[in-house]
């Protein structure tokens, strides 16, 4: 029997997801479809009777709005919310804002897959002349970050490395106190949590496609190890289509 339950949810489709662009730390909002995904995710949690004690999320609006929508659906908008840059999306550096399919057509799908799916290979850095450099690096929500903490690019390994301290120092104690925890975050930061919780290999985690807007449930033992595979709260067809859509990103259009 599970000692704890942990629920994760990836934000709904953003405006830049809709345009198939590398979103990174750019603060894209939810698209209309993404808002509907978040509503359906919240309804799935409501239908399953989930209640929470604390929520944790990033400082990016597409996730914050997803969380708001979920909490509205389950009528728990009063819950405390902790926001942290450590749960932000991976920083895609110089690729930020580029269309993934066009980038694949220009550089080849193999190169884009290396940038997107290699565990420890970072993309090109975001240079000061990048059109979104000031938009991100000068954003006051990051004013307290040190020069070492504020990235110009990240590999998945880097993203996991900055998310894990928050997991160990903030999330784990909440779970062990018996708090019912909901984490709303991004594909790469949630991959990091999944890798750590499940003990996945570097290769396995890079093939894990987490769907947008669909709650993911872990049942954990007293050592916070899963007693069964992650469970998606949604009908099988919807979940499969959402996973396939994520997997198809980064491919050149035929």
Swiss-Prot record:
Residues where Phosphoserine is found: 14, 23, 31, 118
Q: Which residues carry this modification: N6-succinyllysine?
A: 251
Name the keywords, alphabetized.
Answer: Acetylation, Glycolysis, Hydrolase, Isomerase, Phosphoprotein
Query: SUPFAM superfamilies of this UniProt entry?
Result: Phosphoglycerate mutase-like
Q: According to the UniProt record, list the residues that bear Phosphotyrosine.
A: 26
Query: Which is one Pfam family of this protein?
Result: His_Phos_1
Q: Give residue numbers for the site Transition state stabilizer.
A: 186
Question: What does the entry list under GO cellular component?
Answer: extracellular exosome; sperm principal piece
Q: Name one GO biological process term.
A: glycolytic process
List, alphabetically, the InterPro entries matched. Answer: His_Pase_superF_clade-1 (IPR013078), His_PPase_superfam (IPR029033), PG/BPGM_mutase_AS (IPR001345), Phosphogly_mut1 (IPR005952)
- SMART domains according to UniProt: PGAM (SM00855)
Q: Which residues carry this modification: N6-acetyllysine?
A: 106, 251, 253-254
Family note: Belongs to the phosphoglycerate mutase family. BPG-dependent PGAM subfamily.
**More info:** This is the product of a processed gene created by retroposition from mRNA of an expressed gene. This gene seems to be expressed.
Q: Under what name is this protein listed? A: Probable phosphoglycerate mutase 4
């Amino acid at each position: 029997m599970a000692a704890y339950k942990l629920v994760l949810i990836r934000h709904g489709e953003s405006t830049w997801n809709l345009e198939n662009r590398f979103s990174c730390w750019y603060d894209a909002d939810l698209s209309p479809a993404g808002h509907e995904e978040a509503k359906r995710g919240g309804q799935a949690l409501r239908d399953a009777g989930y209640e929470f004690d604390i929520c944790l999320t990033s400082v990016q609006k597409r996730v914050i709005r997803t969380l708001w929508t979920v909490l509205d659906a389950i009528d728990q908008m009063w819950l405390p919310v902790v926001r942290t840059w450590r749960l932000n999306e991976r920083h895609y550096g110089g690729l930020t804002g580029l269309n993934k399919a066009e980038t694949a057509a220009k550089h080849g799908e193999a190169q884009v897959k290396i940038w997107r799916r290699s565990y420890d290979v970072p993309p090109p850095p975001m240079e000061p002349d990048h059109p979104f450099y000031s938009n991100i690096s000068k954003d006051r929500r990051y004013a307290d970050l040190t020069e070492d903490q504020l990235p110009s690019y990240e590999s998945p390994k880097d993203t996991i490395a900055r998310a894990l301290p928050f997991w160990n120092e903030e999330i784990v104690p909440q779970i062990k106190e018996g708090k019912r925890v909901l984490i709303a975050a991004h594909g790469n930061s949630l991959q990091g949590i999944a890798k750590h919780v499940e003990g996945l290999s570097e290769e396995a985690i890079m093939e894990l496609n987490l769907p947008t807007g669909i709650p993911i449930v872990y049942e954990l033992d007293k050592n916070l190890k899963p007693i069964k595979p992650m469970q998606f709260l949604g009908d099988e067809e919807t979940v499969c289509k959402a996973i396939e859509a994520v997997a198809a990103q980064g491919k050149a259009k035929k």
